[in-house]
């Protein structure tokens, strides 16, 4: 179903409340990555260009709800936002202070300091919606949470619409899940099958090839009868992995498993690594990355792909030397003619680490939200926007 778009509304002289996801990583009060602030800029600038006054809402971290906590204050975010916009940004400490005027920007302090935010309290939702004439939901990274500022306010506001960032995210995932150019290849990595079981089952229905990596691949290898040594895998989920492999055969989908792997005695820096065929992993070794023949196998499928969705690395890339497979995969995808969507915190972190983010088709800003979309779930705030359209 369609949603009302911010671009289509007359915002001249109006107060526009924009829910963004400015939940940036911080260390000692310093922002270590401002990607989410930069992603919000076009929406805020569009509202200003249309002659609106802007009030921005966001959460930061996980403070005790209803209590002010300086370490979770949005003050550093207000300063960085002001630098990037090239104009002052007022930090409002309370709902009563959250006022603005055409051409001006106010950032309300962390919405999680407000009692009732996470419980989706109707009274708080009405107050947040009532801060302006138009309520813009633009926080894809929080769209999977039914909170007062994400879902409740959207349902309560006089006028509610989707911002450009949220629209771009939904359109990217629509291209992957609902109207994809085929063949479609999904790469699902990460540590545990248990966190991605619904995702794997849903994707298998939609894609042509499902590639598994990381600890997830270890569980599938064990389910296929291979010895995986000391590798991280989930013994209790071997039947589930076997079911998924059987379903792939039934649906005539490809589910290629690694054919060779990089191993070490433990997951730690500067380990002595070894290359083994999957049938020859010693009992004292851990599988920590894919080998070159596996990479070649995966590239064979990716070379034919028109659409690729990547959720999770194929090795322990955060520790050298176990990132070679993930890096090589990222480099291959960066040169691909396919439409590539990278969604999920670790795979996004990987392409950023290797300086390849700008060469991917679309980088999602929301980890949990993108995971829920890939699982086939409806995002509460998007459902609310669709109901209002």
UniProtKB/Swiss-Prot annotation:
Q: In which pathway does it act?
A: Carbohydrate degradation; glycolysis; pyruvate from D-glyceraldehyde 3-phosphate: step 2/5
Q: Which UniProt keywords apply?
A: ATP-binding, Cytoplasm, Glycolysis, Kinase, Nucleotide-binding, Transferase
Q: How does it assemble?
A: Monomer.
Q: What is the lineage of its organism?
A: Bacteria, Pseudomonadati, Thermodesulfobacteriota, Desulfovibrionia, Desulfovibrionales
* Entry superkingdom: Bacteria
Task: Provide the top EC class.
Answer: transferase
Q: Which residues bind substrate?
A: 21-23, 36, 59-62, 112, 145
Protein name stated in the entry = Phosphoglycerate kinase
Q: Which GO terms describe its cellular component?
A: cytosol
Q: Which GO terms describe its biological process?
A: gluconeogenesis; glycolytic process
Enzyme Commission number: 2.7.2.3
């Amino acid at each position: 179903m369609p949603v009302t778009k911010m671009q289509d509304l007359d915002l001249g002289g109006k107060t526009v409340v924009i829910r963004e996801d400015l939940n940036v990583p911080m260390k000692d009060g310093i922002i270590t990555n401002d990607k989410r602030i930069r992603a919000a800029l076009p929406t805020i600038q569009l509202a200003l260009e249309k002659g609106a006054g802007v009030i921005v809402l966001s959460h930061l971290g996980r403070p005790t709800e209803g209590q002010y906590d300086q370490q979770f204050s949005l003050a550093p975010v207000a300063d960085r936002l002001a630098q990037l916009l090239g104009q002052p940004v007022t930090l409002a400490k309370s709902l009563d202070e959250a006022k603005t005027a055409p051409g001006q920007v106010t950032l309300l302090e962390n919405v999680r300091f407000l009692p009732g935010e996470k419980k989706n309290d109707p009274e708080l939702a009405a107050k947040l919606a009532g801060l302006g004439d138009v309520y813009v939901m633009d926080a894809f990274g929080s769209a999977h949470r039914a909170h007062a500022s994400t879902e409740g306010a959207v349902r309560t506001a006089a006028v509610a619409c989707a911002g450009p960032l949220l629209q771009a995210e939904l359109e990217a995932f629509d291209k992957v899940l609902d109207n994809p150019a085929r063949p479609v290849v999904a790469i699902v990595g990460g540590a545990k099958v248990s966190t991605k079981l619904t995702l794997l089952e849903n994707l298998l229905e939609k894609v042509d090839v499902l590639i598994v990596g990381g600890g997830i691949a270890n569980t599938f290898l064990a389910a296929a009868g291979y010895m995986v040594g000391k590798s991280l895998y989930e013994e209790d989920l071997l039947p589930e992995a076997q079911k998924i492999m059987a379903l792939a055969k039934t649906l005539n989908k490809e589910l290629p498993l690694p054919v060779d792997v990089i191993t070490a005695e433990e997951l730690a820096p500067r380990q002595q690594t070894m290359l083994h065929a999957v049938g020859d992993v010693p009992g004292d070794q851990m599988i920590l990355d894919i080998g070159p023949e596996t990479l070649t196998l995966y590239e064979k499928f990716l070379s034919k792909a028109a659409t690729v969705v990547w959720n999770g690395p194929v090795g322990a890339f955060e520790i050298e030397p176990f990132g070679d497979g993930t890096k090589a995969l990222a480099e291959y995808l960066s040169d691909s003619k396919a439409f590539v969507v990278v969604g999920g915190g670790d795979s996004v972190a990987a392409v950023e680490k290797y300086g390849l983010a700008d060469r991917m088709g679309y980088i999602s800003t929301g980890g949990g939200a993108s995971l829920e979309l890939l699982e086939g779930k409806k995002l509460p705030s998007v459902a609310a926007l669709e109901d209002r359209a």
